[in-house]
Amino acid sequence: MLRILPLGGLGEVGMNCMALEQRGDAILVDCGVTFDDRGLGVDVVHPDFSPLDRLGAHVRAVIITHGHEDHIGALPYLLKRHDVPIYGPPYALGLVRSRLEEHEVLAHARLIETAPGRVFEVGSFTIEPIRVTHSIADATAIAITTDVGTVVHTGDFKLDPTPPDGEHFDAARFSKLGDDGVTLLMSDSTNVDVEGATGSESDVGEAIERLVASAPGAVIVAMFASNIHRLRLLGEIAKRQRRKIVLLGRGVGTHAKVARETGYLPWPDDIVLPDELARERVRKELLLVVTGSQGEDRAALARLARADHPSFEVAPGDRVIMSARTIPGNEPDVYAIQGQLMRRGVEVITARTERGVHVSGHAHRPDQRKMIELTRPKCFVPVHGTIHHLTRHAELAREMGVASVAVTENGRVVEVSRDDDRARVMLGETIGAGRVHVWGGQPIAPSVLKMREWMAEQGVAFCVITYGAGGVPDVLLETRGVMDDERGPKDLEAAVHEVREALAGAQEHATDEDRAELARQAIRRSFKHSRMMRPVTVVKVRR
């Protein structure tokens, strides 16, 4: 029997990480992060790896399908807990090296390059990477030979008929696997609701070049930093249109550096202009590639919109091309930045105003259907998506005649069994899955996050109670984030009065801790009455 335990990526978008276990051996497929958008000082969120201990297996390795952060970003945190080798395609490992170096764990890491068609063994598993197309270079699916037969994990994919790097989706290999028999297919569910062709990266290049050629000033392209295919096309466009590429933003600089080092970005040496020289060039000679397509406040696009970027300032006649999908939930921030740019006389182009400036890297429903047709699996488990995406993808598999289909979420085991030529998937035990929030490289306790959230919603009150020689307490009370209006002094005075009343009623033998608690309750009670708020309240008693 094969057991599959998703630690992340099922029931959500991002943080992809899945364990496969048989005979006491386990491998992880991908190890990614997600982000917390609540504004609580969280850098990244990664899977809780403790369920691996409860799985009762020895983790032999991590197999990386491609280099997106939601597939590799948690590796530094995993390696601090499990000393395991990491297998992955060259470009992904280039990004992994950069990430591990930042966390000072590269020296002890074992990174092993994979290649499509090159089979290798990890414990009781045999693994074959297969070329797929995606919005990042060097993306692969994996075929895993297990005790129950062949398991195919697609990773992130789409069917791009004209990939910019010439690395085509290997439909023939998937078809051959289908001929030989696939027990289980686990397939990318992200765009299951989208009908129609997914679109090719090469088509994006044509649309953007038309906009660059007609622009009277500088052109700024905001995109996901990891889309090396698009970055490659922009370099070719810049050369033909006699412009220089300027990279603004740490992410795009890192990806360009790794891509050039690994041969995936064949730019001529003179195509890139250092950002500190951008102000010296004629605007029509510049093609800037910037981070911040999702409205991130500290990213390059937001800084350009605020006119506080040290290297460049936008001006009337410039053109911004939003060459990225806006992730649901980010719309207010993205629209606010676009508005700031427009107030500066900048033309803003989006996929809504100009078709073709962006295509998705994830398979639309027809591509998902094609993957099932090629592999003809006996069993199916949808991966990578919310419960809505997973359920819709499962429905598609059933429509196409897949005999055994299971929908699971993070922490719920799927058991795969096979008897002669019959195979089935069943939901097994719930081992559990959690999330670890990280700030400054260190985990943040859930209690700390809860307190931060409470402070953000309700504010903070600070109270110092000083007992002098006469025994009558002096009460000093200040607040932050509770009030700032004409009623403020009156409400503050009322809260101080409540504290004094509470202290006056304290029993004679009450400790300072007892008095502090009486004061805390009085403050919260007073502000609940006057402000409908219960601020986090800190009380100190001094004598």
Language model features with spans:
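A glycine- and charged-residue-rich anion-binding loop/surface
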Residues: L10, T34-R38, V45, H58-V59, ...
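Extended hydrophobic secondary-structure segments that form protein cores and membrane-embedded regions
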Residues: E113-T114, V289, V538-R542
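Short glycine-rich phosphate-binding loop at a beta-alpha junction
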Residues: P85, V381, T537-V541
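His/Asp/Glu-rich metal-coordinating catalytic cores
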Residues: M1-I63, H68-E280, A299-E313, P332-Y335
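C-terminal tails and terminal domains of large nucleic-acid-associated
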Residues: D512-R543
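Hard-cation-handling environments
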Residues: D193-G329, D333-T353, V357, A363-T511, ...
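Conserved hydrophobic residues forming the short capping helix/wall of the S-adenosyl-L-methionine
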Residues: L100, A397, F527
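Broad gene-expression machinery/nucleic-acid interaction feature
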Residues: C17, S124, A139-A141, E285, ...
